[in-house]
Amino acid sequence: MQSKFSTFGLPGMMLLTFAAMAPPAQAETVAYNADLKGSEEVPAVTSAGVGPAEITYDTATKKLMWTVTFSGLSGPATAAHFHGPAEQGKSAGVVVPIAGITSPIEGSATLTDAQAAELAAGKWYINVHTDANKGGEIRSQVVKK
């Protein structure tokens, strides 16, 4: 009686061995940024407020990390969030609240696979709210560098 493995032959067995030894997919850190301004809000807001955001996502740990810096707002920031999924010019709900409202804001969160896919597809935005602009004073889509 023949073994199941003898039907593969030597080349087949070598292929299976090499496939089993292949290294796992490499994790990477993906860099994103955002350029927050009033004209990006929906609807647009007249504001002298501006702010860059530097964002990274680690594919191994699923950790999103950010630094959001802003100035020129109509008053103190009252809230800040990541929203999605939404294309530029569209609105969506909060997906990750940003703790702290004093510039610069630094923080992190662990994403689900679905959230990471939305982020990678450019479907997330950040905005910063004030009392004068409760819906958001400055906003920007999060884009890969």
Language-model segments: which ranges?
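Metal-centered catalytic cores of metalloenzymes
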Residues: 2-5, 23-80, 84-145
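Bacterial N-terminal signal peptides
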Residues: 11-20
